[in-house]
Amino acid sequence: MAKVPSRSPRKRVRKQVADGMAHIHASFNNTIVTITDRQGNALSWATSGGSGFRGSRKSTPFAAQVAAERAGIAAQDYGLKNLEVFVKGPGPGRESAIRALNAVGYKITNITDVTPIPHNGCRPPKKRRV
C-alpha cells in the first residue's frame, strides 16, 4: 500500500488589515455589530442575542456594549487599529456600541449615521396602544 504523506496542521495566517469599518445596526429589538475591512469583507461580527441576552434584555444598551466588545476583540487578530463607524437604526444600543469599540482600543476616525429615511415611501406601522 502506498503511504499517504501526513499533513501537519498549519495555523491559518490571517491577513493584516490596518483600517476597517464597523457597521452597527441598532434596531428596537437587537443590535448587530459587524467589523469589515475597507472593501466590506466581514472580519468579525456579534449580536446582542448571540452574546447571551434573550427577550427584552437584547434591546438594552448594555447588551449592545457586550456585542461590540466581542466583535472588537475578535477583529483584533487581523491587526486593526483604526475604525470608521457606520450607525444604522434608532435602537438604544447606538451610543454604547461606539463607546465599547473605543474602550477595546480602536481609534475611531469618523462616525456616520446611515439610517435609511424614506422619501414618503411605505406607510409606517400603526402606533402602539399599551
Swiss-Prot record:
**Lineage top rank: taxon:** Bacteria
Keyword presence, rRNA-binding: yes
Query: Which Gene Ontology CC terms are recorded?
Result: ribonucleoprotein complex; ribosome
| A molecular-function term among this protein's GO annotations | structural constituent of ribosome
By its UniProt entry, which PROSITE patterns does this protein fall under? RIBOSOMAL_S11
Q: Where is the signal peptide?
A: none
Q: Does the entry feature the keyword Ribonucleoprotein, yes or no?
A: yes
GO terms of biological process kind: translation
Alphabetically list the UniProt keywords.
Ribonucleoprotein, Ribosomal protein, RNA-binding, rRNA-binding
SUPFAM superfamilies assigned? Translational machinery components
Q: What does this protein do?
A: Located on the platform of the 30S subunit, it bridges several disparate RNA helices of the 16S rRNA. Forms part of the Shine-Dalgarno cleft in the 70S ribosome.
The text of the family note is: Belongs to the universal ribosomal protein uS11 family.
Oligomer status and interactors: Part of the 30S ribosomal subunit. Interacts with proteins S7 and S18. Binds to IF-3.
**NCBIfam families reported in the protein's UniProt record:** PRK05309.1, uS11_bact
Q: What is this protein called?
A: Small ribosomal subunit protein uS11
Organism, scientific name: Shewanella denitrificans (strain OS217 / ATCC BAA-1090 / DSM 15013)
Q: Which gene encodes it?
A: rpsK
